[in-house]
Amino acid sequence: KIDGYPVDNWNCKRICWYNNKYCYDLCKGLKADSGYCWGWTLSCYCEGLPDNARIKRGGRCN
């Protein structure tokens, strides 16, 4: 399992504006163990994602 910021089809992090429930539901939908809104980046962060999940690994948001 991996941890990280899930991305959309354009390699952009999911913005959350401190909404932990949104991120938790998003991450659970991606089969993660849990998730929360990381306030420093205002982006969802998932813990325990499947190894093949799409997470931010660098590169620009298109």
UniProtKB/Swiss-Prot annotation:
Keywords (A to Z) from UniProt: Calcium channel impairing toxin, Disulfide bond, Ion channel impairing toxin, Neurotoxin, Secreted, Toxin, Voltage-gated calcium channel impairing toxin, Voltage-gated sodium channel impairing toxin
Location relative to the cell: Secreted
Main location: secreted
Expression sites (tissue/organ): Expressed by the venom gland.
SMART domains: Knot1
Pfam families: Toxin_3 (PF00537)
InterPro entries: LCN-type_CS_alpha_beta_dom, Scorpion_toxin-like, Scorpion_toxin-like_sf, Scorpion_toxinL, Scorpion_toxinL/defensin
LCN-type CS-alpha/beta domain mapped to chain residues: 2-62
Protein name: Kurtoxin-like I
Organism of provenance: Parabuthus granulatus (Granulated thick-tailed scorpion)
